[in-house]
């Protein structure tokens, strides 16, 4: 009962975070005070929760694209961009045991799809926090870019909570007892030279954008399976 109660509370809190503006109609999770202790208190369905997680991820990916492009235009000369593209994958998540092709993704279970999403989300929480501290040292970084990185960092934590609830619901109250923050390879104890810092921050933004898109793809595949499992082979 304690586990179920914790899940319900997390569902309610996470659903509230997803609404950036006060809703004009009653909340989908409407537990009145007199109902709070009742087993009949409604909770958000797995299907609706998955939809919100996907919407959340779409927004994060869109803002990551905008942030990466803005940083690139302001601080990264074209030859440096080209050099990075030729260097290949230098992202902190490159060695994660996550399928990279659609054919590989088709072979893994729904639970492992969510587990892969959680792995990616947790690995980026600390790097995005650190990115904010490094951008604060720039003399001419616009407030809009700072606000975008702060927004992504906050929403990533919200996304983590939503994915945890989804996994619990799919595993009937259980949760995979793992944390992947240890994969974060950000060095917090050194202050690099200006160019090195720019290149590192650029790499962080580009890699996060790439992984945000991967998270979105995995979640949409999961959604497709929920609707019609046998027609997602070409997703």
From Swiss-Prot:
PROSITE patterns named in the record: SOMATOTROPIN_1 (PS00266), SOMATOTROPIN_2 (PS00338)
Signal peptide extent: 1-26
GO terms of molecular function: growth hormone activity; growth hormone receptor binding
Swiss-Prot/TrEMBL keywords: Disulfide bond, Glycoprotein, Hormone, Secreted, Signal
Disulphide bond pairs: 31-41, 91-207, 224-232
Native source organism of the sequence: Gadus morhua (Atlantic cod)
Family to which the UniProt record says this protein belongs: Belongs to the somatotropin/prolactin family.
InterPro entries hit by this protein: 4_helix_cytokine-like_core, Somatotropin/Prolactin, Somatotropin_CS
Coiled coil residues, start to end: none
Entry-listed glycosylation sites: 147
Domain of life: Eukaryota
Subcellular location per the Swiss-Prot or TrEMBL entry: Secreted
Post-translational modification: A smaller variant of SL is probably not glycosylated.
Tissue: Pituitary gland.
Protein name: Somatolactin
GO BP terms in the entry: animal organ development; growth hormone receptor signaling pathway; positive regulation of growth; positive regulation of receptor signaling pathway via JAK-STAT; response to nutrient levels
Coarse class of the protein's main subcellular location: secreted
One GO CC term on file: extracellular space
């Amino acid at each position: 009962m304690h586990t179920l109660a914790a899940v319900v509370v997390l569902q309610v809190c996470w659903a509230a975070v997803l609404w950036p503006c006060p809703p004009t109609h009653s909340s989908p999770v409407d537990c009145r005070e007199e109902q709070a202790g009742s087993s009949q208190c409604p909770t958000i369905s797995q299907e609706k929760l998955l939809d919100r997680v996907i919407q959340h991820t779409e927004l994060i990916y869109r803002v990551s694209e905008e942030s990466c492009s803005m940083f690139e235009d302001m601080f990264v000369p074209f030859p440096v961009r080209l050099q990075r593209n030729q260097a290949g994958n230098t992202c902190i998540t490159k060695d994660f045991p996550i399928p990279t092709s659609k054919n590989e993704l088709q072979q893994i279970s729904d639970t492992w799809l969510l587990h892969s999403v959680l792995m990616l989300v947790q690995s980026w929480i600390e790097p995005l926090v650190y990115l904010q501290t490094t951008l604060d040292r720039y003399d001419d970084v616009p407030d809009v870019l700072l606000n975008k990185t702060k927004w992504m960092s906050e929403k990533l934590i919200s996304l983590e909570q939503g994915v945890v609830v989804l996994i619990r619901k799919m595993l009937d109250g259980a949760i995979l007892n793992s944390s992947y923050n240890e994969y974060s390879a950000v060095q917090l104890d050194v202050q690099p030279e200006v160019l090195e810092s720019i290149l590192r921050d650029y790499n962080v933004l580009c890699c996060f954008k790439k992984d945000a898109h991967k998270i979105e793809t995995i979640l949409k595949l999961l959604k497709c399976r929920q609707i019609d499992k046998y027609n997602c082979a070409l997703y």
